[in-house]
Amino acid sequence: MTLERMKRWQKIVLCILCLTALTVLANYLLQRFWAHRDGQFVPDYPRVELTENSDYDTIFLQTGLGRPAVDKLLADGNFQAILDAQDLFFNPPKGECTALLGWFTREDMLETPGPFLADIQPGDILITLSTHTIGWRHGHAGIAVEPDTTLECAVWGADSACFPAQEWTDYTNYAVLRLKDSPPETGQKVADYGLSTLLGVPYHLTSGFIGPKAPDPEAWQFGLHCSYLVWYAYQHFGYDLDSDGGRLVSAYDLLHSDLVEVVQIYGMDPRQFLKEEG
């Protein structure tokens, strides 16, 4: 190898090393700072004393508990759980950014669990915005198939599977949503369909984006990602939860669908949901 050619290769290697270093640095800055600019919400408004006669909006602003959860807790004679939720809503545990796929994809997790899940029914939708990739806070979604079990397509390289629902309280923020004005039987049908058809399906990031948005589940290329799993289960019964109608279904799309109501939120600003309802 001539001296000139050797110098040329040295420059190429040096450029590759510099680009790699810049990529790693950019990813670190995005994941460490940009992704956390709108992380866990802590109320910036006054805490008030709650009573069993407080209106739904006040309880929601103070605890993150929606009407379905409040009704259930009051019917169970468990007003103390509402007060406990208020404590954690205003004084959340410390969060930590942890690795899901190295520094590429990370999750913001609480050091100790947040409020317990007040009311989970089959078919309920669970969402967190704690998951972020290269600074993009895309979140994660799952569907309840039992009061204590969720069906999720959790991570690239793994098939959809069932997980303990209570693990959602480890996230720095989460939401429980339910189809509006529908009987429990509807949610049960969606949950049953998920278990019979969408369990053990490969993770495909481009699901619904390339090819038909809702292909036959028997198609050879059929796959899921977290939000698409939820959307696909509900579209089978005629409910399109994709709020922006695009090809890519995201956790944000599900969270802001007009077809769902809030059962419970934590680490999210309740005012955005009251504004949407208004």
PLM region spans:
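Short, structured beta-strand/loop micro-motifs enriched in basic residues and often containing a Trp
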Residues: 100-111
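Glycine-rich catalytic cores of cysteine/serine-nucleophile enzymes that process amide/ester linkages
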Residues: 120-181, 210-218
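Activation targets extended, charge/polar-rich intrinsically disordered C-terminal tails
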Residues: 2-100, 217-278
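Active-site nucleophile-His-acid catalytic modules used for acyl/amide transfer and hydrolysis
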Residues: 175-245
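Short amphipathic alpha-helical segments, especially helix-boundary/capping motifs
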Residues: 100, 166-169, 202-208
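Boundary regions of SH3-family modules and the immediately adjacent low-complexity/disordered segments
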Residues: 152-153, 157-158, 163, 185, ...
